[in-house]
Amino acid sequence: RTKPELRNQERYNAAKLTEAGVPVAFNTDALVFPIDLLAASAKIAVLAGLPWQQALESLTIRSAEAAGVADEIGSVTVGKRADLLVFSRDPIDLLVKPDAVFVDGICLN
């Protein structure tokens, strides 16, 4: 079962849009598509041709831009909130968990 707006979704869309110069952001409506699976969208796009760096940007700065909050979050920049996940492995690996979680610069683990 899937949502009607996903009917024409194709795994190559992110790569095609990026090649055409269109910024791509990954998102989820967490009650329907669990946020834990957000990296899966990026991983599928990479396997379908989206460059890894573009996938990471789509999960971070492009999503912040789409939400209108890129001045606060989405990149490691002086003056922005220090909400960070630290990984020792590929962050879009489907099974990887963060080594550290920071919210407003405070390590939560």
Where do the language-model regions lie?
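C-terminal cap of metal-dependent C-N hydrolases
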Residues: E65, T77-N109
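His/Asp/Glu-enriched, well-ordered alpha-helical/loop segment
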Residues: R1-F87
